[in-house]
Amino acid sequence: MKKVIAIVCAALLLLSMAACSSSAKKDKYVVGVCQLVPHEALDAATNGFCDALKEALGEENVEIKIEVAAGDSNTCAPIVNAFVADKVDLIMANATPALQAAAAATADIPILGTSVTEYGVALGIENFSGTVGGNISGTSDLAPLDQQADMITEWCPDAKAVGLLYCSAEANSKYQVDTVQAYLEAKGLSCTQYAFADSNDLAAVAQAAADASDVIYVPTDNTAAAATGVIDGVCRPAGVPVIAGEVGICSGCGIATLSISYYDLGYATGKMAAKVLTGEADISTMPVGYAEKVTPMYNAEICADLGLTPLDGYEPIA
């Protein structure tokens, strides 16, 4: 009788262990992607994320719901709230306003950001150490700001007045222009910030910047990236060169940039997501990742129109 009881107990123990093992891994994961606006950089990041996630988990084992806020940061909140209501397994927030909305929506569902420049600024974390903690981590698209500032003096050595053009609704854009301004002013250049609220007043603000500046700096800024034609339509006819924070902006209105690969950035985020979903990594201790490589690039067409000779070490934008 004791042997029978022992066998039954052992069998129950094995069944219990099997149940625990099966609950650790799901048959299919559901991931919600909130992307702020459709443009080259963010699209590439989303594509890289999806590719990495499908490769790591198997395409049949993951459902990815992609929602785009069409450039309206207020639309991010209902998108991520719907993901929370649907009890998705993970949220990927593509751009700072998407990350801020996701962070406000849930403290339980894992959140990975990408195309976010500075997490401490975006989330209001003082003395940011590189790890957000809680349910948030991700990747940053920050290219070295001191090197971007140096590009301004390298490409426009005679410039005295620098205009810093950015969207006031994007906290990370303000962080970038403040940092670049401090660096340039230490070199003796005069800097003026030109903030536009949204795409509706961009043309007027860009015109004011072009009228008073020898060169304009546009940081990594989602609103600017979605409206480069407006900036180019003002600055190129005025003969004012634009140094851009990322390649998407540069291809539309800039002469040069220090660029990262947004596809690779999104891909790295997707690999992080797979580890979080399978329990291989703890998101609360996962440090924010950064691009491994930055590439100096130039816009051949705009350089030619402005009579500028590309500098050595810069690659043409394809």
Regions found by a protein language model. Name each.
Residues 30-50, 65-76, 169-173, 221-226:
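Extracytoplasmic "Venus flytrap"
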Residues 1-30, 55-59:
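Short, low-complexity disordered leader/linker segments with a strong preference
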Residues 65-127, 218-245:
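Beta-alpha junction/loop-to-helix N-cap segments that form part of ligand/metal-binding clefts
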Residues 171-240, 246:
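Pocket-lining segment of extracytoplasmic ligand-binding domains
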Residues 119-161, 260-281:
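Hydrophobic alpha-helical segments within soluble ligand-binding/sensing domains
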